[in-house]
Structure formats: structure tokens, C-alpha cells
Amino acid sequence: MANTTFSGPVISKNGFITTGPGATKTINSTGLGTAGLPLTVNAHAGRILISQDADGIYTLPSINANANSAVAGSTDYNNPNNLGATFMFYIDILATDVQIQTDGIDKFTGAAMIAVDDGAKKAFFPAAANDVLSMNGTTTGGIVGSVIQITALESAQYLVHNTLILGSGSISTPFSDT
């Protein structure tokens, strides 16, 4: 099916439901080196990204908050503004060294909850300079079933939300700087 672009508001009285083979996408960065897998809005946003890589590196696209063309402005369907693009990750293989990172300019805000099987849980908030979310399969989470949701919020800020990372042991923050 082709892409359809609307320049005005779209109203649905009963919601939109994404289903079918395009609703999920299996990802891994095997063989891609330290740069990892570069995610794009067209190929990865709005889908459940099933991570099948124990030591994957996934790089979020640079946030483009203002990309109006000189000719058409915000109604140009080729406008690359990506605010609101959401990336949902599902950990399908124990993450021993999985990293979700920004371009280094964009930073994380929001929170991530890490829970362990003894009922302990803790919310972690990224520091102002944090641009990496790492999971090691234990203290920073990454056990199979972990879910991470990240949305381009505004210029230079990705929001980490609706996130439950499963861990073990003495849990610690998954956020760091590059």
C-alpha cells in the first residue's frame, strides 16, 4: 500500500489500529561495528522493534524539530520534521550489552523503571547529558520481556516513557553519556 499524507487534522471516531506484518520489525546490529544499526523514522518508528541481538547498538535518528521548506512550509509532505516519532523496543534475547543511543546531540528525558523478580523496583531519571540507555542483562536490565519506548519530544530531547526494564541483582541506572 502506498503512503498517504494529510496536511490537515485527521479525526478518527474509533481510533487507529496498527496490525499485520508491518506492525513489528526484527532488528539486530550484528556485523555493523560500533556505529550499530541506524534507525529511521520511515523504517522503524511506530512499530514494535524486536531486538534479537545480545550486544546490539541501536542509534536513534537525529531530531529534526524545524524543517519547513522555503516553498511549502509545514504543509510540504516531504517535510523531514520527526517530532512525535516513537520507537518501541522489545527485548527478545537476553541483553548482555545492548545500547540505545542518540546522535550525541539529542539527550534523554523522562524515566525508566527497572524491576527485579523479588518485587524490588526503581525508577531512574537520565541526567541532562545522558544520551545512552544500556542494558547488561542484570543490574541495568535487559531480561527477555523488557519494553522501552522512546519518542522525539522536542529539539534535542528524546522522551523515555512507558518503559519497564526487567533486571536482576542490585539494580542501577541504565542511563549514561557517550
Q: Across the structure, where does each feature detected by a protein language model lie?
A:
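Exposed extracellular interaction/assembly regions and N-terminal maturation sites
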Residues: 6-121, 157-178
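Generic marker of residues within folded, mature protein domains
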Residues: 77-79, 140, 150
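Short aromatic-glycine motifs in intrinsically disordered, low-complexity regions
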Residues: 1, 59-60, 135-139
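Localized edge beta-strand/strand-to-loop motifs within extracellular or lumenal beta-rich domains
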Residues: 151-156
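Parallel beta-helix/beta-solenoid repeats that form elongated, surface-exposed shafts/blades used
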Residues: 1-8, 148
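Structured beta-strand segments within beta-sheet-rich domains
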Residues: 124-146
